[in-house]
Amino acid sequence: MLSTISIRGAREHNLKNVSIDIPRNKLVVMTGLSGSGKSSLAFDTIYAEGQRRYVESLSAYARQFLEMMQKPDVDHIEGLSPAISIEQKTTSKNPRSTVATVTEIYDYMRLLWARVGIPYSPATGLPITAQTVSQMVDRVMALPEGSRLHLLAPVVRGRKGEYRKEMAEWQKAGFSRLRIDGEYYLIEEAPKIDKKRKHDIEVVVDRLVIKEGLETRLAQSLETALKLAGGIAISEPADEGSFEPMLFSEHFSCPVSGFTIPEIEPRLFSFNAPQGACPACDGLGEKPYFDVRLIVPNESLSLAKGALMPWARSTPPSPYYMQILSSLARYYDFSLETPWKKLPEKIQNVILYGSEGEVIPLRFSEGNQIYEVEKAFEGVIRNLERRLVTTDSESIREDIGRYQSAAPCEVCHGARLRPEALAVLIDHHNISDVTKMTVKPALEFFRQLPEKLTEAQNQIAERILKEIIERLGFLDNVGLDYLSLDRSSGTLSGGESQRIRLASQIGSGLSGVLYVLDEPSIGLHQRDNDRLLETLKRLRDLGNSVLVVEHDEDAIRLADYVVDMGPGAGVMGGKVIAAGSPQDIIDCPDSLTGAYLSGRREIAVPDKRRKGNGKKLTIKGATANNLQNVTASIPLGTFTCVTGVSGSGKSSLILDTLYTAAARELNGARLISGDYKSISGLEHLDKVIDIDQSPIGRTPRSNPATYTGAFTAIREWFAKLPEAQARGYKAGRFSFNVKGGRCEACQGDGVKKIEMHFLPDVYVTCDVCHGARYNRETQEVKFKGQSIADVLNMTVDQAAEFFEAVPSIRDKMAMLARVGLGYIKVGQQATTLSGGEAQRVKLAKELSKRATGRTLYILDEPTTGLHFEDVRKLLEVLNALVDQGNSIVVIEHNLDVIKTADWLIDLGPEGGTGGGQIIAAGTPEKVAETEGSYTGHYLKRMLQPK
């Protein structure tokens, strides 16, 4: 077998005909400037080809269910294994996906509760035992005389298949009727059922009317049904709603309450299967409701000023709604100018929930006409509820949904499962009790479980427990011990979700695989980094090739082999500058990475720390998530860094509490903040901006030029050119989103999508405009010999130079270059930008606005995806914002950023329930001397003179 992955002539994106041999079964780190071609080589070439070859080897039927990768632009690659990529982007937003389901821990837990759990009656608290036929007969005979019922044998429950053969056998045995998926049929008239879908089939054993002397026949029919369905029978009312259906089981039933569990199988504990999901919330554990805090986000506003957000969306507010409110004000005698919070509770309730049948004269005017209608007032919330149910429009449904929050389901109280599943206990815990635990307590629960089980139970549980304990151990090892097992995947950060998938990959125990990882150290404190690196080494030692795109210094130093890409970014990158051991990189004079590793270049500690403008922003009594009544002060006019181990409460304090509270007050945002007692100092600010890593646009039509507003200036500039004016072209002519100037063959996309079925969709360059997006006439308008299509194809650096004489465009381009994005194309599709790049495009947009010196900027891990040199440039930009009088709060683990901050707030001491306290606050020097601060421990050596 080949000992290397041999790549020849890789030209994907900006790669310059790269040829390299990468050792197999080693830990290989790819590093280099942001945009230098690391991901193009690791993901778009090596992973894409490995995955493509594997999928291509499958049958055409299997291929249609798998995403096919495009063939990368490379001459040839040898020595590839099946490839698995673990990226940050693929966090599932599915509300049914949890930490336990993603890691497969929940699958093993379901098996454990099904095989070892003991059902207890909710009524008596005693274990449930088998039911006798006599007890079943007594329960049916207790129905009112004359009740008509069907006695059913559930022979198929939630299984796929056609069941033709079985139907013939049932008919042969003397049965004439079936119920298939809730509908009754004669067996000979039963429809052909779809073998690819799950079905419920019950045989009708008997049809009865309750009367005296029926006991013998009923007992015989019950015995037949139980025998046919493996110990289960159903009594179903023939007249709908006359009585509740009864489920009988020879196995588990409470003699007092009649509470019955049909079967204890793993699917009973699945909240994604109808057999296990709570019927009230369909297994989601929560139900949406209209939240008054979202409907009236700012209680200081009056009704006239738009306190009711759903009715104040338009400017000016809709006259129809204002006339309704005026009628209510006349009838109930209150003023529309009174702030919402000062209105009596009765008035607030009438406005929100309606007049409860009380008829109110509602006066409307249309032009010169005035008319009055007397009717009960529906109420804002009732109006939204009705519209949500009756509308067919997805956009209206989405718009109304913005006023909803989720509350725990009233039936299962957030447990997601039906009562039968929650009645099954192991060591006095149902399955939901354990999923509510965080990783560490859950690990402890399963480790001590064998002592609580009988010898027979231990024989069954041994292998299941081994799998659960191993997987929980991996989560603990990659620094995720603070996560609860029922935590929704959608609430995890990119770094957390990547490390969870990493833990499940190690759990799978595969070998001979190529793993490609994208910055697994994101969001990880230096303390946990060593454990992550041990995990990567373990993955390698299983016999896998581990390829990691990473900027972390420890990871680079620990690697078996390092590939340094460069020398610049974008068109200036795409070459391998150095490849070899970490020492080889350090010794290479051309390697920027080597220069930082060796100390030839460094991010310097500032000579002095800013003291700020003397004002401060203080939040008191914050208790969101795991925060323990935290009070924090941020000096304004400074660069503040919030630090702490993963899960210590940084995001809860800054994003969930401080930002949401400030955004509601300063920006009028419709957000719900975490609980806190008070916030002071907002009067010193005029706005708060959260620059996060969410995409700048979700369609290929969105790009850096459209997002920053530069595209409007570019279109206006082209419209002013003599040729454009001679032809009568306005700025709209130069848009690729509307008819007129765009190429109609591809509708301004530049490419056409061809669906290939069993193969990946192919995007072919439009044969009319050849990818330019515009029609020929529009492209004939040129500035310095370049059309607008040529401008969109330029890099930001080239465009800044090209429009040197046009300040409105040049300044926006220069700002993008300043945040280190000089290499991206002006018209690059937003969907192709990484999270870090999207964040910096947002930063550039904010920087290009006129500075007020009273803005609070909040950034969450802005160094994601950044090389040492990129971090240095970013710090220059952030410090320039602070020098203008603004305040910056950054959540960060990167010690190069932390050491340059003016003020630190360190949370901890641990993650999850062990965190949520401020361990230290002050200058980096002060925090470095604080006992018990993990950040201080690592910071100390960074502050020592080299």
Swiss-Prot record:
| Annotated ABC transporter domain residues | 311-592, 612-940
User: An example of a Gene Ontology BP annotation on this entry?
Assistant: SOS response
Source organism of the structure: Zymomonas mobilis subsp. mobilis (strain ATCC 31821 / ZM4 / CP4)
Q: What NCBIfam families does the record tag this protein with? A: PRK00349.1 (NF001503), uvra (TIGR00630)
Q: Where are the zinc fingers (C4-type)?
A: 743-769
Report if keyword ATP-binding is assigned: yes
Name of the protein in its database record:
UvrABC system protein A
Q: What does this protein do?
A: The UvrABC repair system catalyzes the recognition and processing of DNA lesions. UvrA is an ATPase and a DNA-binding protein. A damage recognition complex composed of 2 UvrA and 2 UvrB subunits scans DNA for abnormalities. When the presence of a lesion has been verified by UvrB, the UvrA molecules dissociate.
